[in-house]
Structures are given as C-alpha cells and as structure tokens.
Amino acid sequence: ILDVLLRLGLYQPGQSELTTQGGLNLTVEARDVYQELANVAMGQAADLLARMLGGFVILPIPNVNVLEVSELHMALNSAASEGTLSAVCQGFIGAGIAGEALVLFHDSSFADLAHLMGHTGSVTRAVELELLMDMSNVLIGAFLRGFANQLDTPFSQGHPTVLGQHRPIEDLIQANRHRWRRTLAIEINYQIRDH
C-alpha cells in the first residue's frame, strides 16, 4: 500500500501525513486506493460483527467520495430517507490524519439488534442507548484498527458521542452542521442477513 501511496503522491517519506493532491480532489487511482483500504478494514469489522452476533454480514463495496457540506447532507438524506435514526460519532487522529466516524442506525432495527445481542428484557430507551454505543464501538473500533494497520500508523480515538436518538436525519444534520465541511467520505452499509 505504501508503494501505491508514494506513486500517487499521497505520501512523502519523512512526512507522517496522508494528503490528497490539490486539496481534496481525488484522482480515480486515489479513490481506488481509499476504497481498497476501506474494503479490507470493513471486512475485518464485519468479521468481528458476524462472530459476535452469530450471523452473516452482507457488505457492499464501500463508496468513497470527496463531498462538500451540501453533498454530504444530500448523501445522508438519501441514506436515511425513511423513518427516524439514531447516530453516534467518534473522532480519531494519528500521524496527520484526523476524522470522524459516523454510525447511523435505523430505529426500526433496535428490536432485531437487541435479539441478536442476546437481550431478553424489554427494549427501553436506556437499552437502545447501550446497544447503540456497543455496536458503534465494535464497528468503529474494528474499522479504524484495520485502516490504521494498513497505513502502519496508530489512531487515537476520542470518546463516542451520541448525536441524537429517534430523530429524522434532517434534525441530526442541522444539529451538527458546524462539525462537517469538505470531507473525504467513506460510506459503508452493514446489513445482517435475515434481520
């Protein structure tokens, strides 16, 4: 991977930071590199999730794009066009790379998630919050570990933050508009078969 990053001009020896050419404008080759890095990392996260839940995890190829704030909002609206969501974000930083992982859960999936996690009682708001934090920690932690290992650079992670529960996506976007700007976005959709 280092050879590819060097060839694309995304990494310079002696410079511990990953950059993109011309700001955040990605070439097709650079997008392919990020997509492959994300694909391997999400595969590792999905493997952990499948073993934890005892189910098969369906994974499409990750979608990698540089998005302006308005495009990010449109992408989030498109991903969650129906119903309400709960969202968690967690910041990370290391070797000149900084970002935020954002996990969105469709609220309709909490009953299935509780069942898969072996919860036998009623699914209260407190239980939903615990499930939300547990799943976010698993997905974000495993993904970032896989991503960092490929780049051979450790990431420090901040504490996860709940952006909102049981809210329309537009409310989540408006409440967090100041957090996002032109961004390299990697969209990953995890689905558990039969749930």
Q: What do these predicted regions represent?
A:
Residues I1-H195:
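Composition-driven recognition of glycine/serine/threonine/acidic- and proline-rich low-complexity segments
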